[in-house]
Amino acid sequence: MAFRTNTSKAQEGGNSLKPEGDYEVIIDTAEVTRTQSGKDKINIVYVIRNDVQQAYQNGLIFDSIWKKKEPNEDDQSIGGYNFGQLMAIANAAKLPDGKEYAGLDDFLAELKGKPLRVHLYHDDYNDKWYEKIDRHEPTTLTAVKHKAKGKSAPAQTAAPATAPAQNAAPVSDPYPF
């Protein structure tokens, strides 16, 4: 099939840093995971909304919330994670103030699918640049018309396991590089 070049649509590889700034996003996943080195963290994946005129629509932004070295009482109520950071996300996602959750997993499940606005900046760590989020705000838009990017299920090549693995490998760092 023939095609023409169109350099106005040129873009760098998928692992390049997104520009610093504000992005309207939807929380795709929010879950407790473990790094390869055995540290627990809350991993939050944001999808850049495709119903808003902005660059990198359907792109992903990764955020991690780590356990505090010296957790206070509020932090301890959620397993030692930074309570203030999670409440900033809850406030931006417009979760009801004062609602009681049975546990951290229930709270994280309620975040899924919520729209908000994040501010992304670049952080230098060990001579590599990473995308980080330093601010969460409520979305500035009233209606959400984001369409999730279709995911095709992978073809099953083997019979499903009959029992869960006892020594499953921990989830690796969410950074794609």
Where are these regions (language model features)?
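Short beta-rich binding modules
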Residues: 1-177
